[in-house]
Amino acid sequence: MILCGDSVAGNSTGEMFRVTTFGSSHGPAVGAVIDGCPAGLELSEDDIQQELNRRRPGTGALTTPRAESDRVEILSGIFRGRTDGTPIAGIVRNLDADSKSYSNIKNTPRPGHGDYTWRARFRNYDYRGGGRGSGRVTIGHVIGGAVAKKLIGNYGLTVTGHVVQVGDVKADTVSLKRIGEYAESNPVRCADPRAARQMEKVILDARSRGDSVGGVVEVVVLGAPPGLGDPVFSKLDADMARALMGIGSVKGVEIGMGFEVAEHRASEINDEFYLDDDGKVRTTTNTSGGILGGISSGMPITARIAVKPTPSISVPQKTVDLERMEETTIEVRGRHDPCICPRVVPVAEAAVAIVLADHMIRAGFIHPTYIGNE
């Protein structure tokens, strides 16, 4: 059956700053094309590489042992060390793909993965390592996000992520300054050292049992001006939620206080306005997470995402052999993360940065074609 609109166009995000990702876990390469970045932005492979290094696997006991260097190659869009206004293409070649362990899942979908649904949607699909649905494709997110971060950084915006929960271990609330200073000081990427130690124990325990564990990642934006966002379906928080839900294993998004607002009265959580010492409008609290009516208020923007446990586990699970159409069991082999939250942090930052870059251009805070007076 052929349906109207039966095409796939879900590999791109953004209107004026547009990022398209491509590639699969065990294909030749993964990457991104960024269209709409103004000319004149200083940009090098190192700017992108430092972000990719934060996402890179094989860096410790808390991540998959898949040892990829993840070296980025910029193919276009840069001239004499600056963007030239044309599409920026960046790729990372897959060098350590091991497809042997995936032959047994061709007809037996792994519980928690998209194997069955992708097969139902596309019939012919790359099942190795999750294919296009693998976490490895988030390299494209990070490439696009690195460019976006560099762009909005020129205008005073910073995007910082950290892990606030792993399993049932929750971090204490810390200052925005502490997040920036301490989140990268431990392998869990948690700004609360006490909680970080407990989180690490939980992750290692899950790994020892052939299991995995989920958690919560928070992203904080500082320096965003008031006025970012469009009605009604292009609200800033709507676009942020869409971008964050585009990350594999993300099952929920909160902006500001999120679902907790349901427990309160308006008199308890309304963010009241005042004038600061510089005469700028601020709010006494920030339960809205820096966004009111879908438009940024000038206060810090906060978002949280719920990340499910990595579904690839060696614990026996029930499934169906789709070739024989009979029930069976499966134990997933291969190299997998016992908790992907630490590696999701730079991906979540990238997703938010891409949305901010797009809205900064759309709202007129960044010229759409060039930076500076040259």
Swiss-Prot record:
Pfam families: Chorismate_synt. FMN binds at R132, G133, S134, G293, K308, P309, T310, P311, S312, R335. It is an enzyme of class 4 (lyase). This reaction introduces a second double bond into the aromatic ring system. GO terms for molecular function: chorismate synthase activity; FMN binding. The gene is aroC. It catalyses: 5-O-(1-carboxyvinyl)-3-phosphoshikimate = chorismate + phosphate. Coiled coil: none annotated. PROSITE patterns: CHORISMATE_SYNTHASE_1, CHORISMATE_SYNTHASE_2, CHORISMATE_SYNTHASE_3. Reduced FMN (FMNH(2)). This is Chorismate synthase. Pathway: Metabolic intermediate biosynthesis; chorismate biosynthesis; chorismate from D-erythrose 4-phosphate and phosphoenolpyruvate: step 7/7. Keywords: Amino-acid biosynthesis, Aromatic amino acid biosynthesis, FAD, Flavoprotein, FMN, Lyase, NADP. The keyword Transmembrane does not apply. Its EC number is 4.2.3.5. InterPro entries: Chorismate_synth (IPR000453), Chorismate_synth_AroC_sf (IPR035904), Chorismate_synthase_CS (IPR020541). NADP(+) binds at R55. Gene3D superfamilies: Chorismate synthase AroC (3.60.150.10). Belongs to the chorismate synthase family. GO terms for cellular component: cytosol. Its cofactor is FMNH2. GO terms for biological process: amino acid biosynthetic process; aromatic amino acid family biosynthetic process; chorismate biosynthetic process.
